[in-house]
Amino acid sequence: MSDTVFCRKYQKELDALPFPPLPGAKGQEIQQTVSKQAWDEWQALQTRLINEKHLSLLDPDARAYLMEQMERFLDNRETDQAEGYVPPSQ
């Protein structure tokens, strides 16, 4: 695997993920098209969504919802946001 990847979110070459973040073909696709930066940002949003919306990863509907939100995020489309979330001040 190369050290960089053309990131579908940022439309430029950025550091690659060191390994597929999901099992199977979807994980391979993400590793080949999503940068580490974009994936880290998605994981932060995913964590906020899970916490604020009280999602259970045992629930197939919650997992499907998160996969949909992931695709939207990585494609630069509007995603749901955690209600009441205030980004930390710099």
From Swiss-Prot:
Highest taxon in the source lineage: Bacteria
Keywords, comma-separated and alphabetical: Iron
Leader sequence segment: none
A GO BP entry: cellular response to oxidative stress
Pfam families the UniProt entry points to: Iron_traffic
A molecular function (GO) term: iron ion binding
Keyword Plastid: no
GO CC annotations, alphabetized: cytosol
Similarity-based family: Belongs to the Fe(2+)-trafficking protein family.
Annotated function: Could be a mediator in iron transactions between iron acquisition and iron-requiring processes, such as synthesis and/or repair of Fe-S clusters in biosynthetic enzymes.
Name of this protein: Probable Fe(2+)-trafficking protein
Originating species: Chromohalobacter salexigens (strain ATCC BAA-138 / DSM 3043 / CIP 106854 / NCIMB 13768 / 1H11)
Lineage, uppermost ranks: Bacteria, Pseudomonadati, Pseudomonadota, Gammaproteobacteria, Oceanospirillales
